[in-house]
Amino acid sequence: MGISRFSSLLVFIFLTTGCYIDKYTEYKESFFSIYLKEWNSTICPKKIAFEKYVKNSNFKELIESNSDFEIKGCEKTESEFNQRIFTPNTFYIGEINYDIKLIIDDSLEFKITNIQNKLDTVAEKAGPKKWIIMNNINSLIVNGYELDNTKTPLNIWIPTKLGKIIRK
């Protein structure tokens, strides 16, 4: 009696889980947003400069500059998260094979180098046999500090305290 119940249970599990078809979703974006964690200020940034440089050029060979970002995290309802979120209005596509300089309000600078990223397939949390193909940012160096970025592979998370204050 017990063996037939066990066999029935195995057949049921096989039929319900074996019927799913693998579903793949591909994101082509290099990253979705840049998070500056531990902002510790009520000041909301007004301006961002996102500059792409030739990799390992010591920030001397500019490829492109962009200031078209949406800035979030300033509202009182979001203040409990103590962060600012910068999302490009025009997304960057593909693996990141360049260095980045991020300048906030002409006063705070982040030099981002050695970005370790690759195209990878990860399981989607929404259900079985659902997969996401995306660019995973595993680690990066910000102003000389190596950061592990594996917990947020589609975003760039940076502690604000790593920013260099620009003297005028």
Identify what each model region corresponds to.
Residues Y35-I43:
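Structural motif
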Residues T17-G18:
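C-terminal motif of bacterial Sec signal peptides marking the signal peptidase cleavage site
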